[in-house]
């Protein structure tokens, strides 16, 4: 195999691999079952606790909305909105830097950060629901 052909194949392989790091932006939305309803204040507390656990910084708290941001390794920045009610919440992309956002696609690490945050919020809500069920008076 000629060295020119080999170099071309290696370049194509590297470009293909580099293109795989960009994925569609992950926006999550969850409706809680009727048995798991919480107060808006409790929903906000669970969301803020999950943000703190994952080292996101809360920028602004307002009724039914939390704005947060994260900077990783002093370079990679992402900002999100979390809208919530007593029975639902949604995490949506707001802004980013150095994560290659373009045409609704972004570096896969952003999606990983949002996915882990989402998992922690759900876990916090589950824990709260279990604790509430255990402390409710039995008939």
Identify the residue ranges that each predicted region occupies.
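Bacterial N-terminal signal peptides that target proteins for export
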Residues: 1-8
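Hydrophobic alpha-helical targeting segments used for export or membrane insertion
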Residues: 9-14
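C-terminal motif of bacterial Sec signal peptides marking the signal peptidase cleavage site
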Residues: 16-19
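Ser/Thr-rich, low-complexity intrinsically disordered terminal regions
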Residues: 21-139
């Amino acid at each position: 195999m000629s060295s020119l052909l080999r170099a071309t194949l290696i370049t194509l392989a590297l470009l293909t691999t580099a293109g795989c790091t960009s994925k569609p932006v992950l926006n999550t939305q969850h409706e809680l079952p009727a048995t798991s309803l919480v107060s808006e204040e409790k929903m906000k507390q669970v969301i803020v606790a999950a943000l703190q656990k994952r080292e996101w910084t809360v920028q602004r708290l307002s009724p039914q909305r939390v704005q947060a941001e994260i900077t990783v390794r002093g370079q990679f920045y992402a900002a999100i909105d979390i809208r919530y009610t007593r029975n639902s919440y949604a995490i949506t992309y707001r802004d980013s830097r150095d994560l290659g956002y373009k045409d609704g696609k972004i570096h896969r690490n952003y999606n990983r950060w949002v996915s882990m945050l989402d998992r922690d919020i759900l876990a916090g809500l589950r824990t709260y629901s279990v604790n509430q069920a255990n402390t409710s008076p039995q008939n």
